Amino acid sequence: MKRIKKVLLSLLVILGLVTLTAASSVHADSDYTPKHLTVEFVPSSNAQKMSARVKPLAKLLEQQLHIPVTVTVSTNYNTIVEAMGSKKVDVGFLPPDAYVQAHKQYGVKVLLQAQRFGYKEPDDQPTNQLVNYYRAQIVVRKGSGIKNLKDLKGKKIAVQDTTSSSGWVFPVACMEEHGININKDHIQTVQVKGYDQAVMSVYNGNTDAAFIFQGARNLVKKDAPDVMKKVVSIYTTPKIPNDTISVRGDMSPAFQKKLIKAFQNIAKSKKGHAIISSVYQHEGYVPAKDSDFNTVRKYDKIVQKINQ
């Protein structure tokens, strides 16, 4: 009997230690406060040009947070997700699909959602109304004979990473809803880096079509002033939630609040607004929650079925 009591007592001690360890782990999992903040962007245009544009953001964040800040541009959508998952990056400017993936795989948390000016079709002229969504477009060269989604069968299309909402997921899902399967209808996809390259691939005749975000043609107006006449939209998708500012899942709530305030203050400043506007056409940031991205999850499921 004494032996049984000793065994039970030992088990209770072990159980207590396990419980304490688990409790401390949970606390540690939400208690990370960076001493040197790492911020990363995904490339929406030429990576070198974009890197030069975002570098000044580091100083503005340092002034707000009073810690060293490093700002970089990732090579693609997947690398930033993996970098946040492996805790090499603290803050990511994640497009909606990349956020959904990062949240599912690594518990990444969304803090803010971007606001942009809306666009009027057909020439993508910006309105004065701020919105928290955007749309994807499928564009072709004018006079190509491609007038609708069915005409894309057998054609060559410039696309972005498969985690890109406007550069892949939403256009592919919408094509599927209209009976065009990107894997089975003899369509050739060409992955390019940045929406400026996607637009120019159509403009120069290197591809028949491109998946872009609405307004992306404006990125190349300086080099191709007649782009609106030569590259036209044949399809515009439903609304896509705007880009996020997201953080690694173990970041402390207190530091999350500091970041929210810092980014909102920067967006309101002259220098800060110039940076975010030139990089992603962001005009400001509003608080966001995970359920805001359920539409993205719906379209992700459609694309996943296509790939099965």
PLM features: residue spans?
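Acidic, polar ligand-binding/catalytic clefts
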Residues: 82-151
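Short beta-strand-to-loop elements that line the ligand-binding cleft
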Residues: 68-75, 90-93, 184-194, 232-235
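Extracytoplasmic small-molecule ligand-binding "clamshell" domains
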Residues: 28-100
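A ligand-binding cleft/hinge motif common to bilobed small-molecule-binding domains
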Residues: 96-107, 176-177, 201-203, 208-228
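Sec-dependent N-terminal signal peptides of Gram-positive bacterial secreted proteins and lipoproteins
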Residues: 3-26
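Short beta-strand->loop
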Residues: 108-131, 185-188, 221-239
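An extracytoplasmic/periplasmic, membrane-proximal ligand-sensing/linker region
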Residues: 31-56, 246-308
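Bilobed "Venus flytrap"/periplasmic-binding protein-like clamshell domains
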Residues: 40-63, 74, 115, 127-199
